[in-house]
């Protein structure tokens, strides 16, 4: 004869969640964690740190309007190329102003 367990099942009857399921759900829906740290001395605010953490998939982040990695030269080769192209054009224009006859026009790619 079996006796029923006295401890409840933490996930409910017949439900189980493994790490992959939890991670998939978090990345699909997204999670925001926010917190502030303030250091005061005699009612004088010395330091305030505001923490904001968003955990989401790239697709979900883009859906929310977060795409800073696409324009950050440290993270995107396309952004670095665009930045260098703009800088090159500005330098060519400056050279043209200084010595109009010496700098050739940019060739079309």
Curated annotation (Swiss-Prot):
It comes from the Bacteria. Belongs to the gas vesicle GvpA family. It comes from Streptomyces coelicolor (strain ATCC BAA-471 / A3(2) / M145). GO terms for cellular component: gas vesicle; vesicle membrane. Its main location: other. A minor component of the gas vesicle, might be involved in nucleating gas vesicle formation. Gas vesicles (GV) are hollow, gas filled proteinaceous nanostructures. It is not clear what function GVs perform in soil bacteria. One of its GO terms (molecular function) is structural molecule activity. Keywords: Gas vesicle. Induction: Constitutively transcribed at low levels, repressed by argR. It is found in: Gas vesicle. Interacts with GvpA. This is Probable gas vesicle protein J1.
